[in-house]
Amino acid sequence: MAITQIQLFSVPVSDQDRSRDFYRDVLGFQVLGDRQLTPEMRWIQLAPPRGDTSITLVTWFPTMQPGDLKGIVVETDDLDGDVTRLTEAGVTFTSGIDEQPWGRFATFDDPDGNGIVLQHTTNRVLI
């Protein structure tokens, strides 16, 4: 196999504009593309400023319902600061900061209930 990375994954949402605004304005992702491909399909692609993996905000996969995706893991250099900033922006954390041997993390949901883990790791291997 010559697979080198995960490039993109789809996040099921109910309102693409609301979700784009959340990922862009609250989480600081950059919009890489926003195009209407067909009358039923709009392609919105975003990524963290220093990330290699991007997301698409999708409404057209009937087997992917908004809120079904859990475990979107994003890395931060400043967990405490980002938890404070996100809380001030109206994000409700579903867990407090959890300390582990490999690092620290806190969890919250996007506007549709897709689960996001905000973490700061001290070790690439998480176990």
Residue ranges: model-predicted function:
Residues 1-20, 69-72, 122-127:
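N-terminal beta-strand motif that seeds the catalytic metal site of vicinal oxygen chelate
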Residues 10, 30-38, 98, 119-126:
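Conserved catalytic-core motifs of GNAT/GCN5-like acyltransferases
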Residues 11-52:
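Core segments of cupin and vicinal oxygen chelate
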Residues 43, 73, 105-107:
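Short hydrophobic/aromatic beta-strand element in the GNAT-like acyltransferase core
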Residues 46-50, 108-111, 121:
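Active-site beta-strand termini and strand-to-loop segments that position acidic
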Residues 49-54, 63-64, 79-81:
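Short, charged/polar surface micro-motifs in flexible loops or helix N-caps
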Residues 101-103:
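Short, small/polar residue-rich loop motifs at catalytic or cofactor-binding pockets
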